[in-house]
Amino acid sequence: MFCGEYVQGTIFPAPNFNPMMDAQMLGGALQGFDCNKDMLIDILTQRSNAQRQMIAGTYQSMYGRDLISVLKEQLSSHFKEVMVGLMYPPPSYDAHELWHAMKGPGTDENCLIEILASRTNGEIFQMREAYCLQYSNNLQEDIYSETSGHFRDTLMNLVQANREEGYSDPAMAAQDAMVLWEACQQKTGEHKTMMQMILCNKSYPQLWLVFQEFQNISGQDLVDAINDCYDGYFQELLVAIVRCIQDKPSYFAYKLYRAIHDFGFHNKTVIRILIARSEIDLMTIRKRYKERFGKSLFHDIKNFASGHYEKALLAICAGDVEDY
């Protein structure tokens, strides 16, 4: 993110909010075999997450049932994933995604990278707490058992949520930049550890200075240097950390573009990013997407999704007329 730039989401608290009325309308929409999906979209995508939690509590009081459980029963496929995802508080949603990325055979390393490289100390702490409450498991222990090597070491460092905050030292930045340059040249295990320690623990303002010093020393952007020197998930994680520090909305725009175009519309990634960033910086992500790729996110979603699933994603994006 450009220094000092204002970022904006696409979903805001609804004015004149009435949780009892919303709960009643959802109760009607979810009755019978043919639920009113348009009503679900109109309500759940036009309320903030805090308002949705109030609706869920009111729904429970009125009908004696958990709203998420009812949505899971009544809906199916990707539309269900969107509606259910909207109902989780943000830390619980991150925990849910991480759990499903690691449970069962195989691990979704890209999900681990996307979430842990982009979250703040506070977000990671809350996510760890939610993970423990929801699954009676320790997030750090699960990551340790499901990953390996320097990739695991870096994830374990991130999940500690020990990044310094609001501190910068120009003299130390020059030293750190030299360490990063040496790590890209020598590529020993010790140098890999030193690199991930700097990228995972230094504050964002400090790393801005480090990246500038690295450019001065090497004549190369750090992302390009990492791509030249390393490979595999360790390389992808380091690049994600750097890109999130440089410009987080651009990182998510890039992830969305790849999810839509490189993987035949990777639904889980698209859904996860749109929901997770909807109240933080999704409008800014849309702007970056259009600037970098020439077509709007709204346009590309319309080309690849369909039906109520498409309508729900577009409602979260809050597209304008000119985006069609």
Swiss-Prot record:
Keyword list, A-Z: Annexin, Repeat
InterPro entries given in the database record: Annexin, Annexin_repeat, Annexin_repeat_CS, Annexin_sf, ANX10
GO cellular component, one term: mitochondrion
Molecular function as annotated in GO: calcium ion binding; calcium-dependent phospholipid binding
SMART domains, sorted: ANX
Annexin repeats: 17-88, 89-160, 171-243, 247-318
UniProt family annotation: Belongs to the annexin family.
Protein name: Annexin A10
Gene designation: Anxa10
